[in-house]
Structure formats: C-alpha cells, structure tokens
Amino acid sequence: MKTTINDIAKAANVAKSTVSKVLNDAPTISEATKQKVRAIMKELQYTPSSIATQLARRSSMNIGFLMNFDRKDDFLNPFFYSLLGGAESVTFEHQYELTISNINNRDNDFMNQYVYSKKLDGMLINPSVLDKDIAKELERLAFPFVIVGQPKEDYGVGVTWVDIDNNAGGSMAANHLLEQGYSRLAFLGSNPEDPISHSRLTGYQNVVSSLREAVDSSAYIRLGEANEAHGYRMMNELLDLEIPPDSVICVNNFVAFGALKAASDRGIRVPGQLGIVTFDNYPLAPYTTPAITALDIDTFNLGVLATEVLFDKIEQLEPGRQFQSIKPELIVRESSRRK
C-alpha cells in the first residue's frame, strides 16, 4: 500500500501540518526536524506529490555542476575548465545559470541543499561525489541529473552518464604503436579505483592480449598518481626490467611528461628506443621535445553533450538514454613515429 503523509507524521511523531511544512521547506521548522522527517520519507520510500509536481513545473533557471574540491588534481587539469566551457555554452543558450558547487559523497546535507530546496532544475555530477544511495534517491524523485565521467559502480538502468570512449582510446593507442613496429607495449595509469584509467587500461589489454606472440603485459603495467613525479618513477621502474618495454601508453600528458624525462635522463632515444603515446593533447604534448603523440579528448564537446542530455531530461524529451560517448582522435607526432 502506498505510503501517505499520515504514515510519515505517525512515524516521525509530528503533526501532519509539520510534514507539509517540511515538504515546502518552511523556515519555521527546525533543521533537526526537517532532517528527521526527510529520513523517514526516504526509509518509507515516500515520494510526495507536492515535490514531484513542483520539480516538474517550478523552474529555478539554474543547473548545478557538482565537484569534490578535496580532489585538488582535478582543478590543476585543464580538462576541467574546458568541460565547464562546453557546459556553460549550452546553459547560456537555454538562458539558464550554471552554478559550481563543492560537495563530497560524505556530505549528509546533499539532498536538502540541492534537491528538496528546489534551488536547481538539474545537476551535472562528477562521479567522485556520487554514491548509490544518492543516485537511487535522485531517481526516486525523478530529479534530472547526468554523471560526467564513468561511474565507479553500476547505479541502475535509469542513470545517465557521458564520457570519452576511453576503452576505444586505449585500443587506438596500442594499435598505433604496433603499426609503428613496437612490440613490447607498457601502460602507465592512475590508481586502480579510477574508472577512467581502468577503461583505458582495458582497451590496451584487449589489443595486447590478442597478439599472436603475446607477452605477459602485467609486467609492463604500472599504476599510481597521475602526475609528473609518478610518471617519472613508474617509467624508471619499467626501464629497470631485464627486458624493458619499447613503448608506453600514458594515462595523461602529465604522466607522459614524467616518462619522457625518465627516458631523457637515461639517454634513451625517443622514438628510436622508446615510443610514447599519451591521453590528453593539452597542455604539454605539442610542446615537449620530441612532441608527444596524443589522443585528443574533446572535453569542450563532452561538456556540451552532457549538458544537452541534461536539458533533454529536464524537458522530458529523452529520459531513457543511459550512456553517451565521444571517440578520441589520435594525433601522431615525433614521440612514436617510426614509419
């Protein structure tokens, strides 16, 4: 039987009028009472018709871009600013405002601040700030949101996310190196929990494992922080092997810059003795010596796509789309060109 407002009031030991005021976020109700009532609503899986109606018809003319500001590396990467530019271009066309908000998945006030308050019509969410409970609650309320980047876990059929086709990119990089005559391909990635790095690694492994004379690729895989220092350290580890790799795919161009420096410090010629390919073309890849072959990721267009899909959800045009991807473009430069 469907849960009613009477059930909520009884379970919370408050009056029906108090529940109604909580639904309307009335300032006369204490935050403690609001949180208590909302927790019971969630527990009893109650979707108030008033919220559903207001979410559908009342517009704040504002969408949120939710990031975890604890992840400082995200803000050092130009990827973030290009992505924002794409999102803002679509938001502007719809005469909406784009609000950047700091949140992490440990913030218990997430739903109160952004959903029940009706301050936003929809959200673009970085995977690092989302967990399964929040995703389920947003779906239950039919609140429009799009995850920008591959989620760490399966949130369910109704959840939509957009990303670069990182798996295809890993395969493109590996195939390019093979075409150039390299045979011992290595991979420098970020931490194992990072779904982006994992997808890029999977694309690389799909190609390497299919080789007629397959090598043990696990010996040529190193994972760590995605920065220059770790790129330098991981590349040196590989070069210390009895049979070192003759080429390497880097998860981003910060790691590639570290790998290139490691080779240079050892007097290893690139591309003669070591081929290097990186994900991300900007900012370092075109300006190193030699210039690094890169998988160019159109992050501006990724921001455009994510925001267009979000507005489709807000306007209830295509709510069922679960995954959209953009294929990277391989830009061949001196670091891997043998032919």
Set out the residue ranges of the language-model regions.
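Short acidic/polar active-site loop segments enriched in Thr and Asp
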Residues: 15, 61, 121, 182-185, ...
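Flexible loop/turn connectors
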Residues: 234-339
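Short hydrophobic segments within beta-strands
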Residues: 66, 101, 126, 148, ...
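Alpha-helical recognition/docking segments in bacterial nutrient-uptake
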Residues: 58, 62-175, 238-240
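Hinge/beta->alpha junction and helix N-cap segments in small-molecule ligand-binding domains
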Residues: 69-80, 100-108, 161-172, 188-234, ...
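N-terminal helix-turn-helix DNA-binding module of bacterial transcription factors
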Residues: 1-61, 337
